[in-house]
Amino acid sequence: MKKLIVLLSILFLIPANFCFANESPEATTKTMTVPFDGKQLSDLTYVIEDTAYMAVYSSLSLLDEKKIYEDLQLIDNMTNVKKLKVFLNSFGGGMYAGFAIADQLKRVTDRFEVSIYASGVVASAAVMVFLVSENRYATEDCFFMVHEISFNPGAGASMSASEIKLMNNLVEMLTARYVKNLVRVTNKSENEWQEMMKEETWFSAQDALDWGLVKAVK
């Protein structure tokens, strides 16, 4: 199994800069970086008064996963923090990282009032992160994308029949989780989402609003 290198990801582009009126962290001066037990928040997160702001503006990676985990641990110990606002602009990236980040954010929804703001593009694994909160917003010109999960064994790598079967089973499990969460928050069926994923479907913020993926476009 050591020779098996799995890459569950899509090609990504560098996201463009974006801004949410009255909500973007760029609209507020960074005034507070709070140390806890010798640690400080990463460059993704800062705190002002009772609100933590987290900006995920890139492809999702294990580094992002680690930073977000550590930041959430820190702000969870800040008794003044009641709200978490996540600003998301990502073409996706590692599927494992996307699922892990989604799990970490979901874990704190009982602790904080979590809101997620989509802008630019939210695609592939980043959609899983977007679905975490019930408070989901998007800019008017934001686009979303869903596609089939795939794997790449790596250049020059070979796979046995049993390894291929194992990977197919894994892809089916990951796809089932992805689709289950899409069905949970939208008015589209499992079959409809599966068909959309086969074709790599891009859709607008207005479509996302009509389907229930987004609570408001602003």
Explain the meaning of each model-derived region.
Residues 2-4, 10-218:
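N-terminal organellar transit peptides
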